[in-house]
């Protein structure tokens, strides 16, 4: 019952309400009383322990990072690289294809990719293409974390 309560608590974290992952918890002591002990009591105890202990663990928000491969005509490479830098992207490589195009490989936070198709089309006069695939999660930068927490709080207050 304690584990079940902890798993349920992990569905809504303390920072912005997002699920908690990579959590390790150890039950050190416990007791059973025939009258007061019930499944709901143990679940509630786990929930209270979770809420008390998690802020002390200094949790951080994680953000999904994806691998971006952009194929653009050579004369648009500078514009696309500048745009990737604005999106907090890290350019990992540039590979000329030999036919007047270059393939840029970068790692970019998924949050920055929402309007990328439209932006790439306007930057390259509809001549650029891209693929984007999830790679891993990374710690969210402090500014982006504060923004996400503020947005989550505003959404919770609106409900």
Question: For each of these PLM feature ranges, what is it?
Answer:
Residues 1-159:
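Accessory interaction regions appended to the cores of large information-processing enzymes
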């Amino acid at each position: 019952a304690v584990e079940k309560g902890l798993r349920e608590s992990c569905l809504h974290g303390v920072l912005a309400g997002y699920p908690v992952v990579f959590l390790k918890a150890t039950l050190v002591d416990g007791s059973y009383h025939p009258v007061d002990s019930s499944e709901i009591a143990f679940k509630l105890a786990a929930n209270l322990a979770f809420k008390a202990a998690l802020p002390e663990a200094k949790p951080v928000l994680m953000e999904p990072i994806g691998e971006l491969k952009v194929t653009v005509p050579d004369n648009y490479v500078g514009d696309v690289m500048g745009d990737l830098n604005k999106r907090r992207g890290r350019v990992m490589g540039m590979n000329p294809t030999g036919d007047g195009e270059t393939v840029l490989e970068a790692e970019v936070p998924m949050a920055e990719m929402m309007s990328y198709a439209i932006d790439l089309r306007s930057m390259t006069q509809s001549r650029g293409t891209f693929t984007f695939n999830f790679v891993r999660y990374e710690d969210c930068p402090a500014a982006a974390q504060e923004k996400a927490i503020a947005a989550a709080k505003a959404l919770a207050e609106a409900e």
